[in-house]
A protein has these predicted regions:
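Alpha-helix boundary/interfacial micro-motifs
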Residues: 56-58, 63-65, 156, 163, ...
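General beta-strand structural signal in soluble alpha/beta enzymes
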Residues: 7, 45, 172-175, 202, ...
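Shared catalytic-loop signature of beta/alpha-barrel
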Residues: 71, 206-209, 215-221, 226-321
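Glycine/proline-rich, positively charged
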Residues: 149-172, 176-242, 247-248, 252
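N-terminal capping/lid subdomain adjacent to the active-site entrance of alpha/beta enzymes
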Residues: 1-172, 177-179, 183, 190-194, ...
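Glycine-centered loop/turn motif at secondary-structure junctions
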Residues: 138-139, 196, 238, 263
Length: 321
């Protein structure tokens, strides 16, 4: 299949800063790519790197792709490229080939349909505000708390306060972004192992400490995130929860097939994509919720500005860029 390859860059400012123990995000940049087949079928993809170093690498590699290229040659060329480029190209090819068919509408706009990221600076007051706004009708909510941003003594005190304030209708995900050592991680695991509000501890130890993560997973559900990106073979080996970010994996079609085949213990998470990448997030999240271990995705819905970049129609986004 002969293809026309096109790309356009984008940049936007998040409506609120997102901070974790490793970095923080104020703005997001990337590219929308468009593939047109010789029979006029169109596929869109999004190159959505999270870090500046990766952004520079992707810029150089995207410039190496010619405007006119055969599908086999394109697939061969991107094998050595950054995973975000591979993800975008494979996403667009999947759309052209009919491997994924997006719905006109997905239903993740309501607050309870996605995990809510707590403000780590004012975590207790933020929790109280959320409860006032959303819990008076008894709906289930899932909260995510980024930890390892303050000293552990202070965060343990906050944990105790949080646990005293949440009822059975609130689930909690605690994400250390790989910044704890084994002592602190085991301490939190011991505190939380019998707590029914906890969905999981997310990447509590550094990406390389697979033995430590495996031992922790025997005490309490552990969800791998960054470890999966560094060691993709863990996707087939890890027996616990997996935080999957399709725009960061080299081929989201693999994730699509896993969810279609009802693979358990997968949770879908954003890397702050535009509406192009969001189509994949919403489609995969819908499949996940129909699977054996349904969990609301982490889509950071309240962090995006009001912009055409987040429309549900790929063509409109492309035309306005």
């Amino acid at each position: 299949m002969n293809l026309i390859f096109q790309k356009k860059s984008y940049s936007f400012k998040l409506s609120a800063k997102v901070e974790n123990s490793k970095t923080n995000y104020h703005t997001k940049s990337g590219w929308i790519i468009k593939l047109i087949s010789n029979d006029k079928k169109i596929g869109f993809g999004e190159v959505s790197p999270l870090h500046k170093k990766a952004l520079k690498k992707c810029a150089k590699q995207l410039d190496m792709i010619p405007e006119y290229i055969e599908e086999f040659n394109l697939s061969e060329q991107i094998n050595i490229f950054h995973p975000c480029i591979q993800s975008a190209i494979n996403s667009a090819l999947a759309e052209i080939d009919g491997k994924i068919i997006f719905k006109e509408k997905y239903y993740f706009d309501e607050i309870g349909k996605t995990a809510i990221l707590l403000n780590h600076e004012n975590v207790v007051s933020d929790l109280n505000d959320i409860k006032k706004r959303h819990c008076d009708i008894g709906k289930s909510l899932t909260l995510k708390w980024k930890v390892a941003l303050k000293n552990n003594h202070e965060e343990e005190a906050k944990l105790e306060e949080i646990l005293s304030k949440i009822g059975n209708n609130i689930k909690l995900r605690i994400d250390a972004n790989g910044s704890w050592g084994r002592d602190i991680a085991n301490r939190w695991a011991d505190i939380l192992k019998d707590n029914k509000n906890i969905d999981w501890l997310e990447q509590p130890l550094c990406v390389d400490d697979i033995d430590g993560l495996t031992e922790l997973n025997k005490k309490i559900p552990i969800a791998l995130d960054e470890s999966l990106l560094k060691f993709p073979t863990l996707i087939d080996e890890w027996k616990g929860w997996q935080i999957r970010r399709p725009s960061q994996e080299n081929n989201p079609v693999k994730l699509l097939r896993e969810l279609e085949n009802k693979k358990a213990l997968i949770s879908i998470s954003t890397s702050f994509e535009t509406g192009i990448g969001k189509r994949w997030l919403h489609h995969l999240s819908s499949l996940q919720l129909q699977g054996p271990t349904p969990k609301v995705p982490g889509l950071a819905m309240n962090k995006f500005p009001n912009s055409f970049l987040f429309l549900n129609e790929a063509k409109k986004i492309w035309d306005q860029l």
